[in-house]
């Protein structure tokens, strides 16, 4: 009966503690709630707005029930956005992960099929020839050997299948849209997390503290769940339990403002062509700049503090074609 009491608590507008949220989401992930109960719970949370404790509990339950990834002892990062910003851009964080890895960083990218865009991380990687359904061991091997691996959310969080039909029927943002970036089964040392709404920056930052993230950035870039070059980027930096909020502009990266329109993507096949050209050093300048800015902030987590220098290094590195070599290696796993 405990589930019913917790559900009743939500229906009456009351918040759940972290442990209560963990218990309720455990029940969801283990298939103990009906579709109707899941739908009611998701809407109750949406109408009131899930708080830090509730999100932290949902993350805890998700990780407790996920397949266990053999976590390496070296530092590694994830760069991932919530999706759902509705902007249909090229796959900036996917490209940034590959570029950073080709420059010596280690990145275990967590991702899924498209939420709202035409082409999610796994859609475009599949189109590029990457096997997104590799085993845990193969993913870990790729991370060790070439510095990057892709962890396909559906493979690691099989309990989410109980929620899938409800989410599809509701056709609206729910708490599950904001869980994705926080539930990487490899539990990375560092995170660059993009959120689709500015008000989520604070919520996410506080959740990252509750989850004891070592060093993370949460970003919202003028309507994008990435660092923006068409406007300002709101940033929360989480380090050793402390949060610092600040704003980044294109000038902070040594770049000029460019239009959001210049980053529009399309179907996976079209995005694949853009990304292939970019990683070969033959892409559009606007694409290269956007990936350079996001990779620059990602590299800051690894101790490369000068964003302008990072951008210059990334742009020079792209021309070498080494990032494309890393992608080609990734397709062999």
UniProtKB/Swiss-Prot annotation:
Annotated 5-phospho-alpha-D-ribose 1-diphosphate binding sites: 81, 84-85, 89, 91-94, 109-117, 121
Task: Tell me the residue numbers annotated for binding Mg(2+) 1.
Answer: 93, 226
Q: Which residues bind anthranilate 2?
A: 167
**Gene expressing this chain:** trpD
Pathway(s): Amino-acid biosynthesis; L-tryptophan biosynthesis; L-tryptophan from chorismate: step 2/5
Q: What is this protein called?
A: Anthranilate phosphoribosyltransferase
Q: Which keywords does the record carry?
A: Amino-acid biosynthesis, Aromatic amino acid biosynthesis, Glycosyltransferase, Magnesium, Metal-binding, Transferase, Tryptophan biosynthesis
In its UniProt record, which GO terms are filed under biological process? L-tryptophan biosynthetic process
């Amino acid at each position: 009966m405990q589930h019913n009491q917790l559900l009743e608590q939500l229906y009456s507008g009351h918040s759940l503690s972290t442990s209560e949220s963990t218990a309720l989401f455990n029940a969801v992930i283990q298939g103990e709630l009906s579709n109707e109960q899941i739908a009611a719970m998701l809407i109750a949370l949406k109408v009131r707005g899930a708080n830090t404790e509730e999100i932290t509990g949902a993350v805890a339950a998700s990780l407790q029930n996920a397949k266990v990834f053999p976590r390496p002892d070296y530092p590694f990062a994830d760069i991932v956005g919530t999706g759902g910003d509705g902007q249909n851009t090229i796959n900036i964080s996917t490209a940034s992960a590959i570029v950073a890895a080709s420059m010596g960083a280690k990145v275990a990218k967590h991702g899924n099929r498209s939420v709202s865009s035409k082409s999610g991380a796994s859609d475009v990687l599949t189109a590029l020839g990457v096997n997104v359904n590799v085993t845990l061991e193969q993913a870990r091997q790729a991370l060790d050997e070439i510095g990057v691996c892709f962890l396909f959310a559906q493979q690691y969080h099989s309990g989410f299948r109980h929620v899938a039909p409800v989410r599809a029927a509701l056709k609206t943002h729910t708490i599950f849209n904001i869980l994705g970036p926080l539930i990487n089964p490899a539990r990375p040392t560092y995170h660059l997390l993009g959120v689709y709404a500015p008000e989520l920056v604070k919520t996410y930052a506080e959740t990252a503290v509750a989850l004891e993230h070592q060093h993370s950035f949460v970003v919202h870039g003028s309507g994008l769940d990435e660092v923006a070059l068409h406007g300002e980027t709101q940033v929360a930096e989480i380090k050793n339990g402390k949060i610092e909020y600040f704003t980044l502009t294109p000038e902070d990266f040594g770049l000029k403002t460019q239009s959001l329109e210049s980053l529009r993507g399309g179907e996976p096949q079209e995005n694949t062509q853009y990304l292939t050209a970019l990683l070969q050093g033959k892409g559009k300048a606007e694409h290269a700049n956007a990936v350079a800015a996001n990779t620059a902030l990602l590299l800051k987590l690894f101790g490369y503090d000068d964003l302008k220098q990072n951008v210059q290094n990334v742009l020079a590195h792209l021309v070498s074609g080494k990032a494309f070599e890393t992608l080609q290696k990734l397709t062999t796993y």
